[in-house]
Amino acid sequence: MNGEASEIIDAEGMTVTPGFVDIHTHLDAQIGWDPQMTPICWHGVTTALIGNCGLTFAPCKPDDVEILAGMMETVEDIPKQAILSGLPWNWEHYGQYLDMLEELKPSLNVAGLVGHCAVRYYVMGDRSFDEQATEAEKQQMAEIVQKAIEDGAVGFSTNRYEPHKAPDGRSIPGTFAECSELVEIAKVVGPRDGLMQLVGADAEVMKSVAETEGSRVLFSYGCSGEEGSGTKAAMHLDEMNTEGRNITGTSHTRGSGYMFGLQAGLPIQGPTWDILREKDFDGRLKAINDETFCEALVAEAREPKSCQIPLQKVYFLGLEDTPDHNSSQNLIELSKSASEHWSETFLRLTKDSQGRGLFNWRMFSTNLKEQGDLFSSENLIPGLGDVGAHVSQIMDGGWASFILSH
């Protein structure tokens, strides 16, 4: 962070607490091999919430380990093999899972949501993907969630976003669950002061859960980025909290969605680009410094539909060690100012940065001004860093430092 503070406190030798609470981390796996919980521990976060988006590793029967690890891989892009080898998998129930986490001695406070995927699969097995639960099964799920909260979970998470798939292509358990199933679970979560995180829920489901006695709903929120959208979205969120409902949104603090470059993904199609993708980093760097190879890359990029990403929403993060998330010129504008094709600009900036340069497709929070207006709502809190997931794509672990600078 650059700039002078209005007040400086000498904290040498002191513990600075409390800090930021990061409520959307997906650090469930990483904590196994990185109990320091980097990089959020470097950005003032002192408490991390795991178990987001309906995905957790408990409860888990011994034969179901690969199922839960596989779903975490396909939804959150955390390698299954790293999950299987990085954790001891010596638990079945959620309380035992929390005991294991405590033994890891994480550097931050850790709070966990128990996930719908694990609970539903534990109760229903393979039927959990496609079938509705019986009344007895709904009650059994509620009892498991109640026990998890009594053993230390701070709430429950579910995911109704259909594109989130299991390894076999089916939407993850809970995606199509009846609203009554969630209400039954909310009946045991609310009275115990727990959170109900709803991902991808429609207005009717959210309303039904929020109106269950004691319910506190948490969900992901944002605005379109169009002029006035931030204020409008803030007002809508506040209106959702009328009539005694307790609904909190969480949103990105800056443009986020998909990062690409020589060190990560290369979303450009063509035979030469395929060759580049197959190389390791050193091989990629050597290849783009070959003039003939680069000419072939540019020629393929000039073809219609060579890149499906909206390039007018792609921004270069700069050549400095600290990424520039405030850049106002997108890749198309940069290429026009240099009288180049956008692929030539991409390759030139990549070479200038020795392959370290990254390009950010702002899928979410595309307009910082509107995002600031959105945060005028007292029912919205910053987050959605996804620090433990999509590491080569999003991983916005520095959001807390960023928001301090605004």
Task: Show which residues each predicted segment covers.
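Active-site metal-binding loops of divalent metal-dependent hydrolases
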Residues: 25, 45, 53, 251, ...
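Acidic, glycine-rich active-site loops and adjacent beta-strand->loop/helix elements
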Residues: 26-29, 53-56, 223-225
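Residue-level marker for buried hydrophobic side chains located in beta-strands
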Residues: 7, 19-21, 247, 383
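Divalent-metal coordination cores built from histidine and acidic residues
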Residues: 33-155, 191
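A short helix->loop->beta-strand "cap" motif at the edges of active sites that frequently abuts
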Residues: 45, 193-194, 215, 245
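Histidine-rich, glycine-flanked metal-binding segment
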Residues: 1-19
